[in-house]
Amino acid sequence: MKIALAQINPTVGDFAGNTRKILEFASRAEKLGVDLVAFPELAVCGYPPADLLEKDAFVAHAGRSVDEIARWTADAGRPAILCGTVMPAASSNGKKVRNVAVLLSGGKVCFEQQKTL
């Protein structure tokens, strides 16, 4: 298995730019026969998002970007992508969002792992 580690510098709130960086790096990795490309924490939305996490539109935009990246993985032979993002929280602890790593392959989210301290 070939794994590529992508050291990109995402910009907070630049979903289009961050998605483009992710897909450009993944495309280069595909040409090298890579099976999995791993991106940094919060690569989709940028780090640190600070109070932007309180805005529902910010979290929704992150979800749309994840969907776009997942669709890219649908074509046969493309590498899986592991990247960090934010997602709505379904918890009773009062938090609206969660910091997660998502594994994207075959055009969908295959697995997600929430960050815990």
Where is each model-derived feature located?
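Active-site-proximal beta-strand elements of phosphoester/diester hydrolases
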Residues: 1-14, 100, 112-115
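Active-site beta-strand/loop signature of hydrolases that rely on acidic residues for catalysis
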Residues: 18, 29-52, 82
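Catalytic-core segment of enzymes that process non-peptidic bonds
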Residues: 57-117
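Hydrophobic pocket-lining residues that define ligand/cofactor binding sites across diverse proteins
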Residues: 26-29, 73
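Generic beta-strand/beta-sheet core signal
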Residues: 6, 39-40, 84, 104
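Short loop/turn motifs at secondary-structure junctions
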Residues: 2, 30-33, 77, 97
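N-terminal phosphate-binding loop and adjacent alpha-helix
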Residues: 9-23, 60
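Flexible loop/turn segments at secondary-structure boundaries
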Residues: 12-13, 45-47, 89-91
